[in-house]
Amino acid sequence: MQSTMAQAIRDYFSEPEIVADIVKELNQEIALCTIFRNLKREYDHGVTDAPLMTFRELNAEDRNEVFVYLGRLLESVLTCKLSLRRGFKVSKDRNSSGDVVINDIIWEIKGTTGNNSWTGSTHATKKEDDGMNFIGVKYGINEDTKVFDIINGVEGLIGEIFIGVFEKLNFVRKGSATQSNSRTSLLISLDDYDTVKEQVCWGNFRIPQRNGKYLQLEPA
């Protein structure tokens, strides 16, 4: 039953029009995030030359805030998109950030800009150490897009996307909690390639070069 539903989710997120709608909605909504709104306000008051600034040129703190906002958008956009698919009973799991319940089965949703990993959290170690039902996205970011083109809808922050729907996935966890960092990296072993390559909806896995151990995420 679960494998049938997982494949139904994959089929849904493999439809070009659905993927295009997801990217479009993310691009429209991210233009409203606090960082971009602040830049527009500051430009309107003549205290910044933001129209000449590319996304790549934002400082690390501002970029991180954009990506955090994008992650929360992703959870909502995918959950609502899934609710439109006939045969899916979808609800938000309010007990755990990022979780969606589809036909009584819990799935985790995460997005990343990393080459081969998603960000986990040490408070979720038990869940992430077990096999997870996981919808994983990588954003293909247009780094050289001008910030004001994003704000004005001339060009989207996201140009491409990777979507995978992974059933009972066992991640490799890297990193541990420190006084200043409670985050860990969730990676997919090269050994799992034959299994997970069939679970990609949009984009591809890339096999790492030079004896790399973890699969790389390639948006399309």
Set out the residue ranges of the language-model regions.
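Short hydrophobic-acidic sequence motifs that mark active-site Asp/Glu residues
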Residues: I106-E108
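Nucleic-acid endonuclease domains
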Residues: M1-V101, G111-A220
